[in-house]
A protein has these predicted regions:
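Nucleotide-activated donor-binding/catalytic signature segment of Leloir-type glycosyltransferases, i.e.
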Residues: 243, 253-287
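A short, active-site helix/loop in glycosyltransferases that binds the activated sugar's phosphate group
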Residues: 158-182
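Conserved donor-binding/catalytic core segment of Leloir-type glycosyltransferases
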Residues: 204-222, 227-231, 239-242
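A charged, aromatic-enriched C-terminal amphipathic alpha-helix characteristic of glycosyltransferases
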Residues: 361-391
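Nucleotide-sugar-dependent
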Residues: 14-18, 277-320, 326-338
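Carbohydrate-associated surface elements
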Residues: 167, 183-195
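Membrane-proximal helix-turn-helix segments that form the acceptor-binding/catalytic region
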Residues: 94-101, 105, 144-161
Length: 395
């Protein structure tokens, strides 16, 4: 029997699909009892939402073979009272264990995608701990000493560390790298293949060609200044954005008024279009009906140096669509120069997009899709399941 797997991250399950959902849903489909939690609500969250909009009940939804306990405002955490916090964590851990019956006594595995959940381990008491490093956490603007302490403690406690890019090995302490494995982001190739035979979505069909696409979260990691310059230099190119803004339409791109003002100014251009967030199963319908797909990320320190460590989720999904891909020059993506073009600077971007739209891009439809198939999420989870099975067999 497979042990329960308790997974934690700050992103709500019922939101934009990221590697968490792709990984955990596949483990659930393979018979792993999976519970996904964003932790107990905080007093700040309750106040922000308003008590009347918060549920005081503890209830669970099952989605894609994963049990998802929905947030409850009962016993929220507080930064002011450590004793109250301890009680809130203990109650939350007890509720999580009650969601699914245990088939293996004392054999639970905790999988953390974010070090902020390290304190919960003391109350959940799993036998084994997996830490999936999905970001260069210390490079995040505003990273605190408290967060760094949790990050280091979780590295020491983890029995297995997985990293979403090879470059992320560099953010780990040297003495824990021997228990680290590379688990790159993959592609839902079956879903993209299905989308290839479906008609162009109505909102996208209303936009003229050539379409230069971006699918994903629209955050400060996206180089708005670059896109603005390109959109103004090539007025016939139609830039199409498909994805959410952090915090919703009024989220102001993570609280940055400057970034949000730049985004608003970009949208005022006649050849820039934002189609909003879409269900994860429909994203591929937009990717396959572009003329070229892009990863226009900030590669300098304006976004905390994120791109130096990135292996974007959309990379292999773009390749599965079979269309040309132009990307910012990211270290871990450089190995794929034979199927996409990596560039830096407005002139280089303009030249690369011009070539792509003229049919002169690296690779072809077949080679791009072949690489995506070799990097499917199913294959990634094959590797992870092997490692988890090994963990579960340890005393």
């Amino acid at each position: 029997m497979k042990p329960r797997l308790f997974a934690f991250d700050s992103n709500p399950w019922f939101s934009n699909w990221m590697n968490r959902q792709h990984i955990l849903s596949r483990l659930g489909a393979r018979g792993w009892p999976v519970v996904y939690s964003t932790g107990p609500m905080s007093v700040t969250e309750v106040r922000s939402l308003g008590v009347s909009r918060c549920s005081l009940r503890w209830h669970t939804r099952v989605d894609h073979n994963v049990a998802v306990p929905l947030p409850s405002a009962l016993m929220p955490t507080s930064t002011r009272w450590s004793t109250w916090n301890a009680l809130a964590y203990a109650i939350h851990a007890h509720r999580l264990r009650a969601v699914l019956p245990s088939a293996v006594d004392g054999g639970d595995i905790a999988m953390l995608f974010n070090p902020e959940f390290f304190p919960l381990l003391a109350y959940l008491k799993p036998r084994q701990v997996v830490f999936h490093v999905r970001d260069a956490y210390p490079q995040i603007p505003g990273w605190s000493a408290h967060q760094e302490a949790n990050f280091r403690a979780l590295q020491r406690r983890a029995d297995l560390i997985t990293v979403a890019s090879k470059k992320l090995l560099d953010v780990l302490q040297a003495d824990v790298r021997d228990k680290a494995r590379v688990l790159l982001n993959g592609a839902d190739v079956d879903n993209i293949a299905r989308c290839l035979s479906e008609p162009c979505p109505t909102d996208l069909a209303a936009i003229a060609h050539p379409r230069v696409g971006y699918a994903g979260v629209i955050s400060q990691k996206v180089d708005i200044a670059l896109i603005s310059a390109l959109a103004q230099r090539q007025a016939t190119w139609q830039w199409v954005f498909v994805g959410p803004i952090p915090g919703g339409e009024g989220g102001r791109m993570g609280g940055s008024q400057t970034a949000y003002a730049a985004w608003t100014a970009l949208l005022a251009l006649p050849n820039v279009h934002w189609l909003g967030a879409k269900p994860h199963q429909d994203i591929g319908r937009y990717m396959v009906h572009m003329d070229v797909n892009t990863m226009p990320y900030v590669v300098d320190d304006r976004a905390g140096g994120w791109a130096r460590y990135a292996y974007p989720l959309k990379l292999h999904e773009y390749l599965a669509a079979g269309l040309p891909v132009v990307s910012a020059d990211m270290i871990d993506v450089q190995r794929h120069r034979d199927v996409l073009e990596l560039v830096d600077g407005v002139e280089a971007w303009e030249a690369a997009l011009t070539r792509a739209l003229a049919g002169d891009a690296p690779g072809n439809t077949e080679t791009r899709r072949a690489l995506a198939k070799a990097n499917s999420w199913d294959g990634r989870v094959d590797d992870l399941e092997t490692w988890l099975t090994d963990l579960a067999g340890r005393p």
